[in-house]
Amino acid sequence: MSTEDEKLLKEAKKLPWDERLQHKNWKVRNDANIDLAALCDSITDPKDARLREFGPLFKKTVADSNAPVQEKALDALLAFQRAADADASRYAKEVCDAIVAKCLTGRPKTVEKAQAAFLLWVELEAAEVFLESMEKAVKNKVAKAVVPAIDVMFQALSEFGAKVVPPKKILKMLPELFDHPDQNVRASSKGLTLELCRWIGKEPVKAILFEKMRDTMKKELEAELANVSGIAKPTRKIRSEQEKELEEEVVPEAAGTNNSEEAVPEAPMEIDEYDLVDPVDILTPLEKSGFWDGVKATKWSERRDAVAELTKLASTKKIAPGDFHEICRTLKKLITDVNLAVSVEATQAIGNLAKGLRTHFSGNSRVLLPVLLEKLKEKKPTMTEALSQTLQAMHKSGCITLLDVIEDVRVAVKNKVPLVRSLTLNWVAFCIETSNKATVLKLHKEYVPICMECLNDGTPEVRDASFSVLTAIAKMVGMKPLERSLEKLDDVRKKKLSDMIGSASDTTSGTVAASNTGVGTSAREVMDSSSMRRSAASMLSGKKPVQAVPATKKSGPAKSATAKKTDGGPQSKASAAPVIEDVEPSEMSLEEIEEKLSSVVKSETISQLKSTVWKERLEAISMLKQEVESLTELDKSAELLVRLLCAVPGWSEKNVQVQQQVIEVSTYIASTVNRFPKRCVVLCLLGISERVADIKTRGHAMKCLTAFCEAVGPGFVFERLYKIMKEHKNPKVLSEGILWMVSAVEDFGISNLKLKDTIDFCKDIGLQSSAAATRNATIKLIGVLHKFVGPDIKGFLSDVKPALLSTLDAEYEKNPFEGTASAPKRTVRAADAVSSASSGTSDGLPREDISAKITPTLLKNLGSPDWKLRLESIDAVSKIVEEAHKRIQPTGTVELFTALRARLYDSNKNLVMATLSTIGGLASAMGPAVEKSSKGILADVLKCLGDNKKHMRECTLTALDLWVAAAQLDKMVPYITVTLGDQKTGSEGRKDLFDWLSKHASNMSDPSEALPLLKPSASSLMDKSSEVRKAAESFMNEILKICGQDVVAKNLKDLPSPTLAIVAERLKLSTVHEGFSDSVKMVTTSMSLPSKAGSKNNKHGPNDRGSNVSKAVSQRGIPARSSVTMISSQDSIQSQALFNIKDSNKEERERRVLVRKFKFEEPRREQIDELKIELFRHFREDVSLRLWNSDFKRQIDGIELLQKALPSSRKEVIELLDILLRWFVLRFCESNTTCLLKVLDFLPELFDVLKDQSYMLTEAEAAIFLPCLMEKSGHNIEKVREKMGELIKQMVNIYSLPKLLPYILEGLRSKNNRTRIECVDIIGYFMDHHGTEVSGLLKNLPSVAALTAERDGEIRKAALNTLATAYKNLGDDVWRYVGKLSDAQRSMLDDRFKWKAREMDKRREGRPGDARAALRRSVRENGSDIAEQSGEAVSRSMAGSMISRENFGYSDAHMVPRQMATATPGPADWREALDIVALGLPEQSVEGMKVICHELTQAVDPESSVLDDLIKEADRLVSCLAVMVPKTFNFSLSGASSRSCKYVLNTLMQTFQIKRLAHAVKEGTLDNLITELLLWLLDERVPLMDDGSQLLKALNVLMLKILDNAERTSSFVVLINLLRPLDPSRWPSPTPPESLAVKNQKFSDLVVKCLIKLTKVLQSTIYEVDLDRILQSIHIYLQELGMEEIRRRAGADDKPLRMVKTVLHELVKLRGTAIKGHLSMVPIDAEPQPIILAYIDLNLQTLAAARMLTPSGTMGQTHWGDAGSNNPNPSTHSTDAQLKQELAAVFKKIGDKQTCTIGLYELYRITQLYPKVDIFAQLQNASEAFRTYIRDGLAQVEKNAAAGRTPSSLPLSTPPPIAPIPSPKFAPSPVHTKSINNKTDCNEDDAGGDTHPFRGQGEIDNRLQTTNLQTDRYQSSGTLDALRERMKSIQAAAVGANFDGVQARPLPSMNGNTLHGGTRLDADPQTQNIIPPMDERALSGLQARMERLKSGSMEPL
């Protein structure tokens, strides 16, 4: 720079900024901009005043005409923007306009800086200004200026997101840009559109832009949109957000938390398309269209067209608001138009208006809604669909909310048309699902009652819709709002609702999980992609940018340094994610390279490499090669050496020899080093690829490329070569490069390649090349790929020209698929090379994710009622698979398979075939993963083989071929096995399946795959179709080849013998013949015996199934034996037993029977074969031969043999009853009447034997016999019918009537009219003889009444007779049970009932229904007698005896006699119901319990006064129900329904839920009830009953409710009483002696659990219980045991004893010494002493020791008061306070009439021992009457003591006056006690019922044993001396029991279930609060205080 310039610049610096920046000299302006930039960079405060000064300057500086100055001005602007804050945005408009005008056409660097400035303006919150400037920029005529403008909008949107950069303005700009003449502008606009799709979604962009776009552009964009995935996330924030984030990050950074980058990504922003479009005025064009005239036209078509015009205009996205009231009034009329088309059009118009106007349409929507809801009654699908869509649109658009339309909905759901009700509720469900949680929380209170009411609707659709609404509410806000309402639902509806809610929540959770995953991934993608600055055009496919070099340059050194550190130091096993290698080489000058290589390569060598003389260069490269080969640590210098070779001589070297040497050195380095950097490959690859094109260097270059592949993997090398070869101008580079790729694939295989990229490269570049050499090389490459990949590669090349396809096919033949056999010849050294592989599939071909294409619309259309739509959807699925090149991922296909499964059952067979083809294509495209995704659809595919159309079966087999190619045959075997055994498959289907299996059997190399198919195949050898037998035999031979004879024989041994014989014969299995058992030989013999007779008889008896089997089997080659041999041995056979039950496994046989199957089905062939085997196995041979003979006479002989043996073989007959019944069924199915009559003679005798044995048929036996008996009861011979009818009537003796009824009802559905008549008659018989209510016959009357409409007169007559019988029993009540009848039927019935009444009157039988009413009246009048009589009757009719149980173990004082039927005042219904329950009949009592439950429900109402009346009856009710518990359970166990059990438990539950009723239950009743409940809880038969698990649960819950609400004192007393061993007679069933002890133990465990529950809450309920009664019950329990038994049990760890001690311990702990005041019911002066007293004293001592309260003297002292009597000490005041409290407690006892005697006695003792103590000083505030009472009482006690009488037997004649002590200060406060006592949980172990006693309790036991307490050592305890002696003895024992140990031992802590050892006392201050406060601290009661007073340490009060 010249001196003048320097001087000028120096002078200019003195000028103001504006002058400097506008100076005429460009250097001055340039210098000023530089200074300004530096100054702005130095400013740290955004509010600096200088920034305001600089802001206006930039509008001129950035428009400088000098390019360098302009660039510096932009630098200054950027510095200013970085320093300023959002206030600077005021300058944005002028500056942006200037930049748009001058900077966008400048140098590339200038453009880049201008774009950066724009982005900073956006950051400074001037996005609107920025977009306004862009609107001007894109209108620039110069395309060069438009592209940067589009790019900067793209970058702004990409970085800041749609929230900061409004998309609306950008969308307005785009249509013009799509038609721009410049292709770069069009490409950039496409990229910007794609970015918009990422932010606001594809659909809004399509809707707004596509209509304004040319078709070609549309097509291009459609293709690009397919690549847009994921959801965008902003990567940059505006300035204010940055500042806020900085403030928020200060605290986390200080605390050392994670960076903000690791925060959870925000949810993607949702942008409404509605906000993006401009409103359109439709009112003006509507006026012009003639709408108003059209809607008034008389022609319906004109009205429709007028409304259609409105619909069309309103279909715009956003409608401008206006006055639409008149339009809506018109539409309201048109909705109800008589013409459906007009009505539909009007409805659609309303929907469009709602969508376009949104909230502006809310008022009109409210007016229209009632009409729309009313119109839902229209049944036409078009109308219904239009209404549904309109209603949904009104809600979604916000026109109406459910809160606003409650009344409209309420009216609609009461509409008389069910369709209106159901569709309204469906709409409500939709609205709730699309509302937010806050809205639903507001409205649920209104809608839940509506839904609950609709659940009782008579129409199923309405109920289902109501369930949907409740499900939607629960899904949105949880179950809590529904809980109250759900209590009113029955169990079935509750279960249905919970199932619906569960399935809905599962679906929701699955969807949420999936969506979350997607968001996470996309966010990560966005972060990765936004790290580089991109152009808009880079969004287009094929133009995606390479990794940005600037970014990698920065991170390069850091990453390499990290890598070096990692290599040097030891790596941990659980290392972090591997560091991604930087593959882009950074720039490095030759000087740097020389400097770094100075220690490795000589400087002369490098100098010579630079020489211009080729010989010197050749010599230098040779020297370099030697030096490199001599290096020992080549790894460190590898990259530098490669860089050196690339620089000198470089790849532009012209000399071939030098070139070859350079390539050789590179090859050596690549193949020698341990880790060859990918950067080196990138540096060399372009040069090497060019050398491949040269024939002189080709060999060396190819070898070098191969070495690169070994070093870094072929995937990386191929990926880099694609781009080089594609863009290179020399065609040889492409052709020869592809040829090298051929050799590379052969060497390395395909495991490291991205096959999709390779195939795309071949298809798009290689095959499209104009050079033949390139095309041929590409064909070779594809051929080699085929060798590794297989035929699947063809799917990716299907769109190639036909000529090329034929050439490719020829190449495929040269390179056949080798699969796993084609192992690679070379291996890759790099560990991370495998990561380049595209997918984890075995063939390496990529699979496409098609889940996005499986749209809800597609799935919906698959189930459309329109068959064309269904077919289109199936074809669409096939098209999706084709587009994915028949390679798909299983993601998202589960729902697709579910939808396709439904189409396999389509009524349109063509659709089924199309579905089969599609399923096959899906399986083939998905590969092995189809097995998991298809959800068992294969079973449904195989069912299509049952179709009789051959074409259908062929389609199925084709689908199976494709399936087996995808998933192995072994995965299909389970489905095929089921299909082969299914008779519905049909013979043709089974034959085709066997042929198919034979074809594919060769693929089963593993024998275990074929074994499951053996048995169904063997069974098919006996199929009636010869084609099936032939195909099965062929397949069996294939299995034989695969598995071998031994394996087949071993797996067939358990087949039925006839089948086994056939298999052995057909397959020539010698091993099977050898392995035949004797029974099989016997069967073959028996089958061959009657062959001749069978063939003769067959002409006369074609229905003899047994003979058919015998004949068929014998004809198939089973060797026959001579009948003579068999007959000659008959004498020896006769001596054998008739039955063989040794190996009978009846349970196993019954398990195979399908129970609960009431309909009769003909016996199948395999069932007959199985019966034959069982018959020969378990019956004597001669009997079996007779029974299984084709001659009916022989069969009759067999029956006679059974008849004779019946009386003596009852046990055996019962064991084999199921076999006999199956044989009888076979006889019923035959036409031989003689044999049938013989069977019918034998069966009554058999049933009589069963009845005598009290045997009841099992479910399986009934399922075998009864369906056939009912079906055949309509026999065409009258005599047979009569016998069968008698047999059915006899069945009730061995099978309960309720269980028999379903079979009879099934008979009513028979196709045989005679059967139906017989079944109706039988129902009538049972009604007449067993009553209508006993067995639930009333439920079946509707079925009988329905038969009165039959054509057949006999059926009508029978039905009328049966109903007349019902009328006789029920009277007019019968009409309640007959169901809905037509008028004609009612008239017919009415006539018959009148006739019946007349007949009854003639016979003097009274009026219909009188007997029933009389029974009820007699129940009320003398319930006890009737109860007794009916109870006896029922007990006789039941199989299980009902054992009455007695109360025991209660003293007379507390036993309450039970009076069953005493009439007490109460509601009439209640008393009548109680009388019915008292009868004791389980079935009838249900009706009574219903009434009781209803009354109890009413009683809960707080306004009701019923409860007071019911309380008087509570004890009687519970007493009756307690008696009903065993009766109902025994009744249910005898085979009846468990209904009555449920009602009893439910009634008890409702009773005990009301606390006042529970408290009114007396102790004796409670004892009986608890005993019954616990016994049934333990009964092992209960779980086996119907609903057994529910009953057990109900018993448990009921017990808990009783413990919660019953009177607690009674509960304690009852449970302690039940701890004694239970009387054996009280168990529900006879108990073996050896198990009685075990049962008692279990019973005690349950009682203990109940006591634990009561004891746990004792601290809070201590003031609710009568402690005197509880202590009395404990006393009785301990006294009954005795001291010796207590010691023995303590050693045996007896739970009941421990529990009693625990209860006592808790009571002592909670009440302290005051517990002694509750011994009024314990004879404390009895001789010997009660055991409980010793336990109380020792508990007090233990608790005091735990609290560390020790006597005032030394440990050796035996009482309290000997030490320090005259020494005043701090404890004196506390002692005074204790004495005051003790006296207060005594006075309190005296004030209570229950304890006044004991109180006076204690007070008397104090006065006798310590006469100086003035007890009346405490009574200054008491009344004179109370003081007088005490004086008189003391005198009376003194008198009694002199006479030697105990106080417990001497109650005072006068009760004490009330409230002797008004001040509460001396009495312990219950509130205070609760607050200061630490809350302790009782020890409990729920699992085993085990109780761990308190630790202190164990110490008491030990002390009692060490003290060797002998109660008889004391003299009379009636004297004070005796009491004193006893107290001293106990204290001495306590002192001798090591108090140190007591103090040191930790106190236990309870945690609810298990007792754990506690902490030391000094460690846990809370445990020290267990002992009550001062008033209850003394250790040995009154004695301690007496001693203290005596010693004079306390002054008299």
Curated annotation (Swiss-Prot):
Q: Where is this region: Disordered?
A: 236-264, 501-576, 1087-1115, 1400-1436, 1755-1776
- Biased-composition ranges, Polar residues, are 504-520, 1764-1776
One cellular component term from this protein's GO annotations in UniProt: cytoplasm
What are the record keywords, sorted? Answer: Cytoplasm, Cytoskeleton, Microtubule, Repeat
Source domain of life: Eukaryota
GO molecular function ontology, one term from the record: microtubule plus end polymerase
Kindly give the Pfam families that the UniProt entry links to this protein: CLASP_N, XMAP215_CLASP_TOG
| SUPFAM superfamilies recorded | ARM repeat
**InterPro entries in the record, alphabetically?**
ARM-like (IPR011989), ARM-type_fold (IPR016024), CLASP_N_dom (IPR024395), HEAT_type_2 (IPR021133), TOG (IPR034085), XMAP215 (IPR045110), XMAP215_CLASP_TOG (IPR048491)
Which SMART domains has this protein been placed in? TOG (SM01349)
Q: Show the ranges annotated as biased composition (Low complexity).
A: 529-539
- What is one process in the GO biological process aspect for this record? establishment or maintenance of microtubule cytoskeleton polarity
Q: Where in the cell is it found?
A: Cytoplasm, Cytoskeleton
Query: Compositional bias (Basic and acidic residues) at which positions?
Result: 1400-1410
Q: HEAT repeat positions in this chain?
A: 48-86, 164-202, 321-359, 362-400, 441-479, 848-886, 890-928, 931-969, 1007-1045, 1233-1259, 1260-1294, 1295-1332, 1334-1372, 1539-1579
**Family, similarity comment:** Belongs to the TOG/XMAP215 family.
Q: What does this protein do?
A: Microtubule-associated protein that is essential for cortical microtubules organization and function.
| Protein name (record) | Protein MOR1
State the organism named in the record.
Answer: Oryza sativa subsp. japonica
Which gene is transcribed and translated to give this protein? MOR1
